[in-house]
Amino acid sequence: MYDDGKELPLGDGKIRLCRIKTRDKEHIRVYRKQSQSKEQILCMVSGMEGGEFYRAAAIRWLREYARAEFEKKVRFYADKMQVSVNRIAVKEQKTRWGSCSMKGNLNFNWKLALMPERIMDYVVVHELAHRKQMNHSAAFWKEVELVLPDYRERKQWLSEHEKEFAEY
C-alpha cells in the first residue's frame, strides 16, 4: 500500500510515493514536491529498511496534511454557519469519519483527506451542524442542506465508498 511508486488518492487528485535511499538508518525525512509535469510526489528520504517505517511516515504526513485542510474548512464553514468551535483533532477512527462534542470539540478521521474535497466538506458541515442540533433530526438535516443543497449525494458517495478507504 505504501510502496515506492504507489499512487494514493489525495483530495481531488493523487500523490505518488517516492522512497529516496540515504545512509541515515535512524530517521525518515518526508516532504511534498511537485514534478515538472505537475504530479504531486511525497518523498520519503531514509536508509531505513522495512515498509512499516515508510507507512508510518506517510501516515504521519497525511495526518498533518489533513489537519491543515480541516482547519481551513472548519474556519470557512463555521463562519458561514455562524457557529463556534473549541478544538479540532485529527485521528484514525475505525467506525467514524467525524464527531462533535457538546463542548464544540471536533474530531475528524485523517483518511477523509484521501477522499474528494466535496466529501471532506460534507463531513465538516455535518459536524458543524451539530453545533446547532446535537442530533440527526429534520432540523439538523435542514442546517446541512442550507450550506450543501446536494448533501444527500455526498452522503451517498461516502456510504458507497467508505470501505475502499478503510484499508489505508
Regions found by a protein language model. Give the residues of each.
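Walker B beta-strand of ABC/ABC-like P-loop ATPase nucleotide-binding domains
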Residues: V124
